[in-house]
């Protein structure tokens, strides 16, 4: 037993030793990778990067940057690369002692140092590339500026007439570029690449601005010397022609406004000659705005004349229509009021319309007189005609509505008479049906309803014979009589149907009288009620007793009665 225990312990120890050696083998691979990485980063070409700068002009800012980067290389090597060897050595020693965690910590420190060293290299590479790129950009901008300088100088010399009085100042401004180009060469020669870049970039922007001035100045001069004076002339003679055609353009103030614009235009060329183009553009924009305002006023007058010519005849027709309709209404009202009641306000409205129409005709005559003058302001005429058109349209609408009302009075009277005749005819027809029915006698309420309808009809007929007639009151009374007649007819139909139904029920029940005493008794009661004109109650009793001996028969009898 002891032997087994000893063997087990030995096995465990052997396994533990094996695991330790396995772990140390793995850790040693990590150390070997760190050594390989150290060997790789030792070959990073710091010096080659700096060698690219040495090809440049190592003076001034370039020399300062070069020295700083060289110093950074030494510091990076001492601070980051040199301690790596020691860290790796310590890791190996600790690993031999099976201190895995401590060994790993040393390796981690070594990797962090190498990361920092690589970052230092990347930063140096970016700085070098940035300096080289800046040198390249500077040279490209410098070459472009030299080309622009020569081209601008040549353009002013070859096309001096296009720039007018601004040519001299342009030449002066262009000549200022030459010493600034030379200054760039000095900055570059001194190695001050940042200052050189700022200088040449600013110079390039100034050249671009002056180039844009050179492109804009001929257009401004053309507008100032040719286009606007031409528009002034066209506007002046155009207005003169329109005045000959009869337009009143005094409100446009052509002469005074043009003189003011010419004075304002005279200040533009001096601004151009001083290269104050923004102020020159503002003045030109103001002049063009005022010209547009004048053109708008003139165009409005021309359109107003066309509109006046189109609407004049329409307004004439509408005024004549209003006058004729007013005369017709006055005549018609005098005739109609003899036969029909008319509100006094309607008659007053017609007289008021007459006064308004006469007033509008007077205004229209004044407008025509104004249009016959040698100079007419058509915009005012247009406004006045619009006023006339609006008012005469309202008057015509109101007169037409009143005329329709007068026509409607006659139509309403005829309709009321027709309805009254239909009521009389229908009343007699219904009453004849009551008399000819199987009723023992005509119920008293129908006699009363008939007499009431007769009384109302006589009353309305008397009102029809009176003059003037109040049509609305008559129409309302006839409508009430029609309602009475409808009620009379509906109730009469109900009674007639109930009487037939009750009679059919009693006749059908006679077959059960001998066999069923209760049937005989109930039918006797139903007959009594029938004779007293109580048809609904007679139906209830007859239905009840028939259903007791023959279920469903009453529904069949009712359907036959309805079909008849």
Curated annotation (Swiss-Prot):
Function: Negative regulator of FtsZ ring formation; modulates the frequency and position of FtsZ ring formation. Inhibits FtsZ ring formation at polar sites. Interacts either with FtsZ or with one of its binding partners to promote depolymerization.
Extracellular side: 1-4
Membrane topology type: Single-pass membrane protein
Parts forming coiled coils: 99-138, 190-223, 271-300, 350-435, 471-550
GO biological process, one term: septin ring assembly
Organism: Staphylococcus aureus (strain Mu3 / ATCC 700698)
NCBIfam families, per database record: PRK04778.1-6 (NF003412)
HAMAP family attached to this UniProt entry: EzrA
UniProt topological domain (Cytoplasmic) ranges: 24-564
Compartments (UniProt record): Cell membrane
Gene Ontology cellular component terms for the protein in this record: plasma membrane; septin ring
Annotated family: Belongs to the EzrA family.
Designated name of the protein: Septation ring formation regulator EzrA
Pfam families referenced in this protein's UniProt entry, alphabetically: EzrA
